[in-house]
A protein has these predicted regions:
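Generic protein-terminus/edge-of-domain signal
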Residues: 1-59, 64, 72, 78-80, ...
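Catalytic core of bacterial cyclic-dinucleotide metallophosphodiesterases
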Residues: 99
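Short beta-strand segments
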Residues: 66-68, 85-87
């Protein structure tokens, strides 16, 4: 077990919401090779769509939550999709984006 008091500065981080909202989407929600400095958190309420990373297509559907890490290059699209979204930054005390460099979509 790690004593958190041994590394007080390393245990400090902040989460900020850069943008958030509700969206009812159609086929115009489409982008290739998107890459953002923030992470995206999608709560899918209904419909279906996809996220694509390194040639792998990840179906997205109602009732699930998806995380696209900061600086992750991906594509997306749908025919009909209802979602809540949050664009977030998770920064360490040194202003390093904690989720940057994660190569998978969850």
């Amino acid at each position: 077990m790690i004593n958190k008091n041994s590394f007080p500065e390393q245990n400090k981080f902040g989460i900020s919401i850069e943008d958030s909202g509700y969206a009812l989407l159609d086929s115009t929600w489409y982008r290739e090779n998107e890459c953002s400095p923030f992470s995206r958190l999608y709560f899918i309420k209904g419909g279906s769509g996809y996220l694509k990373k390194d040639g792998k297509t990840i179906p997205i559907k109602g009732g699930f939550v998806y995380l696209v890490p900061a600086e992750c290059q991906f594509s997306y699209g749908c025919e009909s999709l209802e979602k809540l979204y949050f664009h977030i930054s998770v920064l360490t005390s040194e202003k390093y984006e904690l989720l940057a460099g994660i190569k998978e979509i969850y």
